Amino acid sequence: MNSFSTSAFGPVAFSLGLLLVLPAAFPAPVLPGEDSKNVAAPHSQPLTSSERIDKHIRYILDGISALRKETCNRSNMCESSKEALAENNLNLPKMAEKDGCFQSGFNEDTCLVKIITGLLEFEVYLEYLQNRFESSEEQARAVQMSTKVLIQFLQKKAKNLDAITTPEPTTNASLLTKLQAQNQWLQDMTTHLILRSFKEFLQSNLRALRQM
């Protein structure tokens, strides 16, 4: 897992760097897997904004996979029954037909609002994940910061920013306190559910964004 941290999934500095270099006109930061020399080369074919978003989401998914691996290795949550999962009352964002993100009834504007709103709702859960990992602490932080960058990317594509719902800070603070006060078993279960749900949400995002 440590080798993953130093190669396939860069440290927090990458995500912090993206936040610092994100200008008003949708820039071309060097994403994971890109060669900075190739990005600057005059004869290379630059990635479109959609391609960069696609690559950025896949980068976050790689980080989630690493975090899930640590979670599964230290507990039996990944093998827990569906009944145990159903007992958890987390209200994690998920896609529904009305969100316009599925192939049937696809609506770009409605879908983009749902994606951004969902990512904003996930932020408090990603904050909860901080300090929940020992060997993957940097990866948890990088997933959180990369998600903030992704939100900024997508907001540049959205036409109806007023329709995007931002969670109330006081509500998030109360939820975070409640989650952190759970017993150890529930905290492990919460960690597992957040990672699993965030992975599924991002995978749905990928499929929807590729239609835009």
UniProtKB/Swiss-Prot annotation:
Glycans are attached at residues 73, 172. Its main location: secreted. GO terms for biological process: acute-phase response; glucose homeostasis; hepatocyte proliferation; interleukin-6-mediated signaling pathway; liver regeneration; positive regulation of cell population proliferation; positive regulation of multicellular organismal process; positive regulation of receptor signaling pathway via JAK-STAT. GO terms for cellular component: extracellular space; interleukin-6 receptor complex. Disulfide bonds join 72-78, 101-111. Pfam families: IL6. InterPro entries: 4_helix_cytokine-like_core, IL-6-like, IL-6/GCSF/MGF, IL6/GCSF/MGF_CS. The keyword Disulfide bond applies. GO terms for molecular function: cytokine activity; growth factor activity; interleukin-6 receptor binding. Residues 1-27 form the signal peptide. Keywords: Acute phase, Cytokine, Disulfide bond, Glycoprotein, Growth factor, Phosphoprotein, Secreted, Signal. It is found in: Secreted. Cytokine with a wide variety of biological functions in immunity, tissue regeneration, and metabolism. Binds to IL6R, then the complex associates to the signaling subunit IL6ST/gp130 to trigger the intracellular IL6-signaling pathway. The interaction with the membrane-bound IL6R and IL6ST stimulates 'classic signaling', whereas the binding of IL6 and soluble IL6R to IL6ST stimulates 'trans-signaling'. Alternatively, 'cluster signaling' occurs when membrane-bound IL6:IL6R complexes on transmitter cells activate IL6ST receptors on neighboring receiver cells. IL6 is a potent inducer of the acute phase response. Rapid production of IL6 contributes to host defense during infection and tissue injury, but excessive IL6 synthesis is involved in disease pathology. In the innate immune response, is synthesized by myeloid cells, such as macrophages and dendritic cells, upon recognition of pathogens through toll-like receptors (TLRs) at the site of infection or tissue injury. In the adaptive immune response, is required for the differentiation of B cells into immunoglobulin-secreting cells. Component of a hexamer of two molecules each of IL6, IL6R and IL6ST; first binds to IL6R to associate with the signaling subunit IL6ST. Interacts with IL6R (via the N-terminal ectodomain); this interaction may be affected by IL6R-binding with SORL1, hence decreasing IL6 cis signaling. Interacts with SORL1 (via the N-terminal ectodomain); this interaction leads to IL6 internalization and lysosomal degradation. May form a trimeric complex with the soluble SORL1 ectodomain and soluble IL6R receptor; this interaction might stabilize circulating IL6, hence promoting IL6 trans signaling. This is Interleukin-6. It comes from Macaca mulatta. The gene is IL6.
